[in-house]
Design a protein with these regions (language model features):
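C-terminal motif of bacterial Sec signal peptides marking the signal peptidase cleavage site
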Residues: 2-4
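Non-catalytic tandem-repeat scaffold regions and their flanking low-complexity/translocation tails
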Residues: 9, 17-452
Length: 452
């Protein structure tokens, strides 16, 4: 047995019932990192997007409800995953981007290598050996896990311990349906780059195959609806279907090009950018509107209740860029202020208020309904409270990281305590407190703070 691989650690989070979707409303320690579990800075492409980039990085995943935590630790010259206090087996390497928690926080999976041999590790059990492997996904009920892996020259899609017939090229991006009874994944069958979108039962006995033109298919947040792009001769169109009736396809209008399939945060409203006769349009549920001239490289957002789309219009001149927020399918209004960049657009639940991150003179601010808040060295990911009366976001100033609570006008109500690292924010069920994970020294903790 390898030293340090099988012991049980302290500070184990309390067990959570299966798929508990209530945010933990009490502050508590989730994990205590042992002194011999070194932090090891990963390559820049593996920085966790869910957190502000810290001064020294450890790959950490925290359940969005506060019900579990996993991290990659370096012990000596090898690596292991610590999940809810249990230390896993040591490997030569563990790919940080593969580390994933189940929705209930009680299961963990990741990709690991010993020498040149790859494994998928699920709840401490090795799957393999493989010559390569892809990404991993848990089902919404946390009972199933899907991943793609290579044996010899063939790739296979797995759900739990069952694999499909395989393909010579690769599979990618398994997504489970809302009721965890079906799985959708991308299949490339030959070197010509023909993509097939497969929707199957979990035993790969019944499936529907759809030939598509792009790898970027989309699934809505509730995992009830799937959308992809078809190409017929020289024209492109969107096709979509519900998991409950995958055989009933809905086909959109034909365009010269289609990109950025985007669902609303809730529901089935679908938007995308389409090109027709050299002009760009934003299409929302089959309604189209001509976009202002410019570029549209950044993600856009569908407003709640199908009220329109918020999209940044970007203009480039050499190395200089400028951007402003455009509200499509909305009454004509004065153009929003131009900034160097705009990002992380969000709306209140009723769609009446919006906020986003803007950069001006190399400083960051949150713009709320067109009004600038205070400027910081960095701000990310604003979120409105459920009642739309408060806004919270993560900020960095003078190398200190903290959460800010602001009113609907962007005025700061309180600045919460600083920590070494802060993860994305959410709200307790009553909407009166903000909750988030932090790393501070050797502790990973769940913090809950009143909004006022």
């Amino acid at each position: 047995m390898l030293s340090g691989c099988t012991k049980e650690k302290q500070s184990v989070p309390e067990a959570a019932p299966s798929v508990k979707k209530e945010v933990v409303a009490l502050s508590r320690v989730l994990a205590t990192i042992a002194d011999n579990e070194k932090q090891d800075a990963p390559p820049s492409h593996e920085y966790a997007e869910s957190s502000v980039k810290p001064s020294s990085d450890m790959i950490i995943e925290i359940n969005k409800y506060g019900n579990g935590v996993a991290y990659i630790a370096k012990i000596g010259e090898r690596y292991c995953v610590v999940h809810n206090g249990k230390v896993g087996k040591l490997y030569d390497s563990i790919e940080g981007y593969t580390l994933i928690l189940s929705p209930d926080g009680q299961r963990v999976a990741y990709g690991a290598k010993s020498g040149e041999t790859s494994y998928v590790v699920v709840d401490g059990v090795e799957k393999g050996p493989f010559t390569d492997r892809g990404r991993i996904a848990f089902s919404p009920d946390s009972k199933h896990v899907g991943y793609d892996a290579k044996i010899g020259n063939n790739w296979y899609m797995y759900v739990d311990n069952i694999k499909n017939d395989g393909a010579l090229q690769y599979f990618d991006r398994s997504v489970f349906s809302h009721d965890s009874s079906k799985v959708t994944y991308l299949e490339v069958t030959d070197v010509s780059g023909v993509y097939r979108l497969i929707t199957s039962d979990l035993k790969f006995k019944q499936n529907m195959a759809l030939t598509i033109a792009d790898t970027a298919y989309a699934v809505n947040a509730e995992k009830t609806t799937v959308a992809a792009v078809e190409k017929k001769q020289t024209k492109w169109n969107v096709v979509s279907f519900d998991y409950d009736h995958p055989d009933k396809l809905k086909t959109g209008e034909s365009y010269d090009d289609i990109k950025q399939l985007t669902f609303s945060e809730k529901g089935k409203s679908l938007a995308y950018i389409a090109v027709k006769e050299g002009k760009s349009y934003i299409v929302l549920d089959d309604k189209e509107e001509l976009l202002p001239e410019g570029e549209y490289p950044w993600p856009f957002v569908v407003r709640p209740e199908n009220r329109g789309v918020g999209i940044f219009i970007v203009h480039s001149k050499g190395k200089l860029t400028s951007a402003y927020l455009h509200h499509a399918f909305a009454p004509a209004s004065q153009q929003n202020k131009t900034y160097k960049e705009g990002a992380h657009l969000t709306y209140s639940r009723d769609g009446k208020h919006h906020a986003y991150v803007a950069i001006l003179n190399e400083k960051f601010t949150i713009v709320v309904d067109g009004k600038e808040g205070p400027f910081f060295d960095r701000v990310v990911y604003p979120h409105f409270s459920p009642d739309g009366k408060f806004l919270v976001y993560r900020a960095r100033q003078d190398n200190r990281r903290f959460v800010v609570v602001a009113d609907i006008n962007g005025k700061i109500i309180k600045r919460l305590p600083p920590y070494e690292r802060i993860f994305d924010t959410t709200f307790t069920e009553d909407g009166k407190s903000v909750a988030y994970g932090v790393k501070d020294g050797n502790q990973v903790a769940w913090k809950v703070e009143a909004l006022q």
